[in-house]
Amino acid sequence: MLHILNKPPHSEAAAQMLSTVTEGDSILLIEDGVQALLYVDWPGWNAKADVNVCVLKEDAVARGLSEVAFRHHATLVDMKGFVELTEQHTKILSWY
């Protein structure tokens, strides 16, 4: 499943999302969700062993956070990568 989070990392939506993430899922942080890059202790970085965390590059750049993505082993994806993630997952859940 692809989880798309546009809320800040310490929001109720983020907490609910993290409670449903399972191994093999992907998380895509967009809009205010990219603020998670500011928090080394955000639980999403260690949600599950086999969870892929991606960050929408355009939103990270707009907030001056693209350079810190490597700290969390997050994958920066552009809009093409966003589309590819939606093609890779049969289920998509947006957390707004």
Model segments located where?
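Short, conserved loop/helix-junction motifs that constitute active-site signature segments
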Residues: S19-E23, W42-D50
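Short internal beta-strands
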Residues: D25-D32, V51-D59
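Secreted/extracellular ectodomain signature
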Residues: E23, D32-G33, L37-Y39, V77-K80
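Conserved phosphate/oxyanion-binding catalytic-loop motifs
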Residues: D59-L65
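Short, basic, glycine/proline-bearing loop/turn elements
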Residues: M1-H3, G24-E31, S66-V68
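Histidine-anchored nucleotide/phosphate-binding helix
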Residues: P9-T22, I27
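Short, glycine-rich nucleotide/cofactor-binding loops
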Residues: L2-A14, E31-A36
